[in-house]
Regions:
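Conserved helix-turn-beta segment immediately C-terminal to the redox Cys motif
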Residues: 52-53, 61-62, 66-90, 109-113
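Thiol/selenol-based redox catalytic cores and closely related redox-interacting motifs
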Residues: 114-193
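Bacterial N-terminal signal peptides
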Residues: 7-17
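Non-catalytic, surface beta->alpha helical segment in thiol-disulfide oxidoreductase systems
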Residues: 187-207
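Thiol-based oxidoreductase modules, predominantly thioredoxin-like and allied folds used
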Residues: 83-100, 116-127
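Positively charged n-region of N-terminal signal peptides that target proteins for export
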Residues: 1-4
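N-terminal "domain-start" segment that seeds a small globular fold
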Residues: 20-47, 67
Length: 207
């Protein structure tokens, strides 16, 4: 028994140090450390966006919030020459509202909403297979902003029906938006109910 105690203590110390190390890596990580794939299958390096203001959104084609594509594209057109990049990540984790292939999603967005901002490959945003950049975004901005009683009620409803939510920081639904400043800081997280026009001033303040 006495021989087991040092071994157990050593194992616990190692585990704690490992957790601390992993936490430090998360804290020290930059959004520019991440890579992903676009909807054509080509690698996208977030370092290429250094110095830009980013608005990163998980999207879906058959959602009640899908009309927000129009507002996101309008925001992109208004501010892209000043350094804004809107990045869409189609996601099928919420009620199966993004069932199409990457090609079908792109066609839908182009024909129905005139989308020209970059679309990434369809990805998970919660759970064990979540796109790593979303794990980073959620860690940096674990709570979302919403306005008024309507926003509060909508958030409560989405939290009740979303099956992919396991942690408080998890994304509740489609069209959650993360605003990232020019230096890579995750400044704000906007709820699905927040229309692009609602936070246009926040975007402009970053430019």
């Amino acid at each position: 028994m006495k021989r087991l105690i040092p071994a157990v203590v050593a194992a616990l110390v190692f585990a704690v140090q490992g957790c601390a190390s992993a936490q430090n890596e998360t804290d020290m990580a930059s959004i520019y450390d991440f890579k992903t794939l676009n909807n054509k299958g080509a690698e996208v390096n977030f370092k290429d966006f250094e110095g830009k203001v980013l608005l990163i959104v998980n999207t879906a084609s058959k959602c009640g919030f899908t009309p927000q594509y129009d507002g996101l594209e309008a925001l992109y057109q208004q501010y892209k020459d000043r350094g804004l990049v809107v990045i869409g990540f189609p996601c099928d984790q919420f009620a199966g509202q993004e069932p199409g292939s990457n090609e079908q999603i792109e066609e839908f967005c182009r024909l129905n909403h005139g989308v020209t901002f970059p679309l990434m490959a369809k990805a998970d945003v919660n759970g064990p297979n979540a796109e790593p950049v979303f794990e980073f975004l959620k860690a940096q901005a674990p709570t979302e902003e919403y306005k008024g009683l309507k926003g509060k009620a909508t958030r409560k409803m989405l939290k009740a029906i979303s099956k992919s939510v396991e942690k408080d920081s998890d994304i509740l639904w489609n069209f959650t938006k993360f605003l990232v400043s020019r230096d890579g800081t995750v400044v704000k997280r906007f709820a699905p109910v927040a229309e692009p026009a609602d936070f246009a001033k926040d975007v402009e303040a970053m430019l």
